[in-house]
Amino acid sequence: MKNPFENLDKVLEHSLRLQIISVLVANDSCDFNTLKELLNVTDGNLATHIKALEREKYISVIKSFVDRKPNTRYKATERGKHAFKKHLDAMEQVIKQQKR
């Protein structure tokens, strides 16, 4: 029998990355400060994990100005949404296998 843990996405195994992608899949996009407040994390911690998700092309960055102030928003890419769904499916399989 195949080990269902092998199907878990290594990038999304970190709880903060999973939280970030969850917010971005559930919403069209989200800005840095809102993510920081929602997830109750520091700027540095959030920035580090956002960069990891960007490297994997799971999220995209949208830079703009709002009232002449810079605004950075993040959006889940199709690749990120697919990885998130696969990760959730794998977690479901892990749970189902443990019930046997």
Residue ranges of model-derived segments:
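Residues within the DNA-recognition helix of helix-turn-helix
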Residues: 49
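Short beta-strand "wing" residues that participate in macromolecule-binding interfaces
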Residues: 61
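Alpha-helical DNA-recognition elements
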Residues: 52
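N-terminal helix-turn-helix DNA-binding core of bacterial DNA-binding proteins
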Residues: 7-45, 67, 73-75
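Glycine-centered, phosphate/nucleic-acid-interacting loop/turn motifs that mediate DNA/RNA or nucleotide
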Residues: 57
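Basic, amphipathic "hinge/linker" alpha-helix immediately C-terminal to the N-terminal HTH DNA-binding motif
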Residues: 66-87
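Amphipathic alpha-helical dimerization/coiled-coil segments
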Residues: 1-5, 22, 81-100
